[in-house]
Curated annotation (Swiss-Prot):
<dbReference type="InterPro" id="IPR016151">
    <property type="entry name" value="DNA_mismatch_repair_MutS_N"/>
</dbReference>
<dbReference type="GO" id="GO:0006298">
    <property type="term" value="P:mismatch repair"/>
</dbReference>
<dbReference type="Pfam" id="PF01624">
    <property type="entry name" value="MutS_I"/>
</dbReference>
<dbReference type="Pfam" id="PF05188">
    <property type="entry name" value="MutS_II"/>
</dbReference>
<keyword id="KW-0547">Nucleotide-binding</keyword>
<dbReference type="InterPro" id="IPR027417">
    <property type="entry name" value="P-loop_NTPase"/>
</dbReference>
<dbReference type="Pfam" id="PF00488">
    <property type="entry name" value="MutS_V"/>
</dbReference>
<dbReference type="GO" id="GO:0030983">
    <property type="term" value="F:mismatched DNA binding"/>
</dbReference>
<dbReference type="GO" id="GO:0140664">
    <property type="term" value="F:ATP-dependent DNA damage sensor activity"/>
</dbReference>
<keyword id="KW-0067">ATP-binding</keyword>
<feature type="binding site">
    <location>
        <begin position="629"/>
        <end position="636"/>
    </location>
    <ligand>
        <name>ATP</name>
    </ligand>
</feature>
<dbReference type="InterPro" id="IPR007696">
    <property type="entry name" value="DNA_mismatch_repair_MutS_core"/>
</dbReference>
<comment type="function">
    <text>This protein is involved in the repair of mismatches in DNA. It is possible that it carries out the mismatch recognition step. This protein has a weak ATPase activity.</text>
</comment>
<dbReference type="InterPro" id="IPR017261">
    <property type="entry name" value="DNA_mismatch_repair_MutS/MSH"/>
</dbReference>
<keyword id="KW-0234">DNA repair</keyword>
<dbReference type="GO" id="GO:0005829">
    <property type="term" value="C:cytosol"/>
</dbReference>
<keyword id="KW-0227">DNA damage</keyword>
Amino acid sequence: MAGKSTPMMEQYLALKAEASAGGDDCLLFYRMGDFFELFFEDAKVASGILDIALTARGKDSGEPVPMCGVPVHSAEGYLARLIKAGQRVAIAEQVETPEEAKARARREGKPVSKVLVKRDIVRFVTAGTLTEEALLEPRRANVLAAVCEVRGTLGIAHCDISTGRMELEECAPDAMDAALARLGASEVVAPENWDGAPADATLRPPSEFASDEGEARLKAIHDVATLDGFGDFSRAMLAAAGGLIGYLDHAGRGTLPFLLPPVVARGEAKLAMDAATRSSLEILVSQQDARSGSLIAAVDRCVTGAGARQLAEDLAAPLTEREPIERRLALVHFFHADPLLRADLREVMRAVPDLARALGRIVAGRGSPRDLGQIRDGLAEARRIRDYLASKPDRPALLDDLLPAMGGHGALVDHLQRALVPAPPTAREQGGYIAAGFDAALDELRDVSGNARRAIAALETRYRGETGIERLKIKHNGVLGYFIEVPAKHADALMAPDSGFTHRQTMAGAVRFNSLQLHEEASRISEAGGRALAAEEAHFEELVATVGDAREAIARTADALARIDVAAGLAERAAEGDWCKPAITDERVLDIVGGRHPVVEAALKQAGDRFVPNDCTLSGSDRLWLIGGPNMGGKSTFLRQNALIVLLAQAGSYVPASTATIGLVDRLFSRVGASDNLARGRSTFMVEMVETAAILAQASDRSFVILDEVGRGTSTYDGLALAWAVVEAVHETIQCRCLFATHYHELARLAETCDSLSLHHVRAREWKGDLVLLHELAEGPADRSYGLAVAKLAGVPAPVVKRARSVLEKLEKGREETGGLAAGLGELPLFAAALEERPEKIGDSMREKLAALDIDALSPREALDLLYALKTEASQTED
């Protein structure tokens, strides 16, 4: 920047340079009184995102300096929008008052009039470091992850600083994308010199990712001499932990958030799914990047935010071991079997505040009296819930394991109940949150203040009588304090030297005064109020410390409540949808009777329609189903619904089916649908091949694979050849359970050579080009794809469909005669000629159909289908 700057602007530029040191690209919120101001390019960026006015302040090099600002009291909402837009924000606060700045100037012998209040960056606000309630989604965890590679092993450390949970894990470098997709991290941190860093990672100095540094930091945080009591951590895990804690230290400017002792995340005990599978199955977000339309939206019946976050974690990382799955299922069954118990419990749970996040804010030094009140109320409700559930017979083992964590806080709850008012405020600056009777000295100070206020009210009455001014009032504001206000027309009476009043301020329609008595009472209020605020602040710090001492026990209580909420919510969902408890087995089977797609079924139900259930039975002797049939017939839905049923079962949930036996799956793969990844130069076909290659390389005989339309997007013969080879590889080499949907009828010949492959199709009917989709799965190969009928159903003009039918007939004739698809095309008339249609005699056609019918042989369903087809044909005739 050229040209002379004001001291304020020099301070701003110095802070901006500090905020941007190390390559950090962030906006600077610069505190000026009651506003956070932004200047230069920051102002342009923020004003565009926030849709606020862009103004100017002063000049730089002869040009106005762009500026915008947001009020401090509502800054959280603006911060949330900036973070959602992908920005990072440095907060520069005033770290001294104007009075302290003036006193400093006097000590330094500098002019008081030119002194500048000190400001410093107190915090960096980023997507992964949020703790404020207004900035977080109640039903979604906010995960920060750090990744690095140590001697060929990838270390991952991740935490949610709003709750303090921290886990360390390791995996092969090529599994990084799948691991990060499972975590759904809001922000990822990586060493800046690492070629393997994720493209969108926040890069940090490599020195922070040293295993020795990570070990030392963890020991210091938890005040232990060894980490052996927490788990067996590898060097890669500790290196990632060092990077994570180093970034948190940087973001908090030396103040670390609340972190629970780290635990080892056992990746091998979780159902492995890559990013493509998660996207395809729409587990936590839909293809439109929204919660609506996702699996969790269809399943979530939790009544607390903590429960919803736990459910999301369960769905993102289902289990692969039978015993813990069955423990979860037993807890769901306990609540499912007793509707009255479930209803009572859920009603009580609705009153449970978010203990984990309130605790996180308190321990991080950003807590409020309201957070303390939430700790008090949450622990009290936990005690009630524990006592209620403990009185029930036949409790499952998991519930008995959870109940002890929900008690033991009696002394803390009693202390908080005595100390706090029933509904503590969010802000503590005005006081009023310590309950009467908790501190006699504080009560006395409040009495002094209250007596002075009553004296001021009496003064107002007295002054009205003495002056005869009925509209005389004693008011208060933050600038003048207490003052006497009268209408301007009565001001002369109070201006007299012997009136006892002192002029303070003249307004447009009123004049303000002071008096000796008012000054004395105001001083008493101010002095007593200041001392009362100091006393409340001291009590607040003591309460925060007391809660902090119990933080690990409170966190365990929060986890137990969340787990119970998840189980009760899943039981509620099962009761709503007539879901069944799945049987879990170690055998390589998948036996689902009456299976439904949970998301599609919910959408159809909302529209007043019904989902058609289907069975799926895979075993060692019949482990690969080849499924044909028309588009829109339900093939993709059938594939996905079975994958989701497996996922739900291994997450510990009931499933949408009449009965279900689930053989444990170690890896779940879905290659259903694709979209062009133009940003990375990948076409639909390339994406399909990359995903298929990953499946062939990573699937085991215990995996479950769903594949849809492999080979589309290239020439017919290339696609058919690829699909053929993939089916053979899955059947002969991998030997896993697999559903394979295709339009290649030629693949049906594989049933002759693949002993464990069977043919299936989705049923459909066609009458004179009108397609009726039954959405039912049947055994045997599909006789045709009904592509032209689907095209007509989609609204393709009739002449085009007719032309396509002519081309199809010639193609099929050529293949029969010469084996070549293109043979016979030369006999086709020109396209324009083919479009010249003569009106079809629909009446004759309908008579022919009716004459050929064997009415006694029609089932009720077939008769109804025929009636609809004839009605459609008649409507087209009228058009």
